[in-house]
Amino acid sequence: MFHRTFIRGRFVLLLIQGALTVLVLLAWLIPEIPAIPAGQDRQVFSPAPPRRLVSLAPSITEILYFLEAGDRLVGVTSYCNFPPEVKNKPRVGTYWEFNLEAILALKPDLVLAMAHQGEGPGSLQVLQNWKIPYYLGRADTLPELFRLIEDLARLTGQEEVARLKLPPLKARARQVQQRVQGLPRPRVLLEIDQEPLITVGRASIQGDLIQRAGGANIAENIDQRYPVFNLEEVLKSQPEVILFTGMADAASLPRRMNFWRQWTMLPAVKAGRLYWVEPDLIDRPGPRLVDGLELLANLFHPQQN
């Protein structure tokens, strides 16, 4: 009886050892998945390197082209309009609402989006439910944008491209901040919309740009990214520069500017410092954000041009 039990136990032990050996071999054969550091939002990875990408954010689309991985994009949103080469890519919806069937039909290895897109009822949870590999990035400041570019470079295997193209981008941003350092900061109102009056708070990418470009955001003490402001608060803050941006039709710009021109006691109105800023340069956390930073610095400190 003891001999039979010993043989059975030895047989089980051999089976376990064999299974462990197979697992080790399989682990050796599985391709390594690029590691993305903590600091971005949720990630669900596909086997590396992903070859069929769907971008649900214009900023990510621009970053992928910056990293010379645009040829891997098989689907984008209707808001993805830069660079021009993206215009012929299949569309899978808007920034907030996407067509799940269209995404599934494209058989992506990975779907990429920004974390803010997952904060509402039309969130990206459905991607997880359908077991679609996805990545959610976050960039609420310029340094976070640079980290996002580095992370996407690792994820797509484009590290060498990032090593060549990212340092000049960072250098331009540093030069702007050095140029405005120590200069008086004009008080700035950035109007996203007028009815109701929506501006940018401390947690927004635009708020970060205003500060780095040498301005003082009059809504800096508000934690919300896009708070609703009121006229009394603006009049009390006495902005020296008023910026207009947002997704409203360009035809509405004269009306929006004329509204503020009636408040002649505002320093910005007295000095004629009311400016339109192309939304994609300051609203979209992609490589062109540095263009937006340079533009804002020139508007805030024209004497330094």
Locations of the language-model features?
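Bacterial N-terminal signal peptides
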Residues: 16-32
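A ligand-binding cleft/hinge motif common to bilobed small-molecule-binding domains
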Residues: 118-129, 241-259
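Short helices/loops that flank or line small-molecule/ion binding pockets
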Residues: 100-107, 130, 229-238
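His/Asp/Glu-enriched short active-site or ligand-binding loop at hydrolase and phosphoryl-transfer sites
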Residues: 77, 203-226, 246, 276
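N-terminal Sec-pathway targeting helices
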Residues: 5-17
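Extracytoplasmic substrate-binding proteins
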Residues: 46-52, 110, 121-198, 219-224, ...
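A short, structured surface patch at a secondary-structure boundary
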Residues: 51-106, 110-123, 218
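Alpha-to-beta junction loops
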Residues: 106-111, 215, 237-242
